[in-house]
Amino acid sequence: MKIQIKGGRVVDPGSSGDKVQDVFVAAGKIVALGTAPGGFHANHVIDATELVVCPGLVDLSARLREPGYEYKATLESEMAAAVAGGVTSLACPPDTDPPLDEPGLVEMLKHRARSLNQAHVYPIGALTQGLKGERITEMAELLDAGCVAFSQADVPLNDNQVLLRAMQYASTFGYPVWLRPRDAALGRDGVAHDGQVATRLGLAPIPTIAETVALSTILLLVRETGARVHLCRLSTADGIDMIRQAKSLGINVTCDVSANHVHLSEMDIGYFDANCHLVPPLRSIRDRDALRRGAQDGTVDAICSDHTPVDEDAKQLPFGESESGATGLELLLSLTLKWGDEAKVPLTAALAKVTSEPARILGIQAGAIAVGANADVCVFDPNARWKVEPARLKSQGKNTPFAGYEMGGKVRFTLVDGHVVYEG
């Protein structure tokens, strides 16, 4: 298939490229920019006049719910949601049922995802067997099966000796370790930030130190072992300050925040809105603003969707009993553009947080509009406005705290491996 994407504003965040030009695609690759190569005859022309042409989005945290939780979502529904949101590559955490701790499970997931011919799926393998925090997994075998990193997902690893050994082993072979800083004891049974809203509503609190105590331990172990660690979904101002300082000292870490936490705070819980029951919890306005500044100054490397589809019944329960999580694949682009507009960040820099930077963290060939790059492309209308209507989302999970919000930026075309997989 040969495709010409004609007359669009081509944005390549990795090179800060931003100009109106044509993009030519053949055999799954971008073969030329600006002028067609000799003998090129397009089978399909996409009119991108007044549209933005950028790399397909790369999402660092998207739960696809297979295997084990198909009653919440399926690969079919969530892959459709991904490409509708312009997401062409995504990393899925290992907290499935059973967890992704055996090569066969990883291979099965990869095979199922490939058969759908939509977004690329990059599994994150379990760091410990069964995510129990006791014995480390066979990382080499999981890597051979298709894992790109190793994590405990949201399951805390309370034994620092096990964490030390896992990081030493990963460091020896150069395996990336992804961790969400969380001290389980300090936030035991908590469901909301330890602030004025939790106090007013009588919700069990999760204090800031539940993140920062764990983060301090991780940073010390990184310095001790030299492991390559990515810190997932930070939520506190103090945590961002610690990362900023660690990076200034040359400690080898990267981090991301969720799009939810870039825009929302504990105040959005209102009167027990379970759609705002998230992990980590929505924190104070001060924390939210610190995440936004961290993304702006480069302390925060990437923004993820933290896509977590939840069945409707689990969100209808009282806040403290409801299941945490929010759907996000179809909102990631618009929420990133909204942050960029509000923070007065150039479009190239805003899009870098969901394209070239997460691709760098994953270590994959993605997130670029350049000759020779894989033709994973998002074409969106930056001027289009749309209302978040949960019933119209492709994801099986309709749970979102942004229901009713008006968003900017609408995906018109998504290409994966040079094929149009979504047109809206």
Model-predicted regions and their roles:
Residues P37-V53:
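Active-site metal-binding motif and surrounding structural segment of the metallo-beta-lactamase
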Residues P103-H120, Q168-L179, L335:
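Alpha-helix-loop-beta-strand connector modules within alpha/beta enzyme cores
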Residues I136-I303:
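Histidine/acidic residue-rich metal-binding segments in metalloenzymes
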Residues M1-F40:
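N-terminal metal-binding scaffold of metallo-dependent hydrolase/deaminase domains
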Residues R200-R228, N275, G294-I303, T308-N383:
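His/Asp/Glu-enriched, well-ordered alpha-helical/loop segment
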Residues G8, G28, E50, S61, ...:
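Divalent metal-coordination and catalytic microenvironments
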Residues P318-E321, N374-G424:
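C-terminal cap of metal-dependent C-N hydrolases
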Residues T49-A113:
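Metal-associated gating/positioning segment near the N- to mid-region
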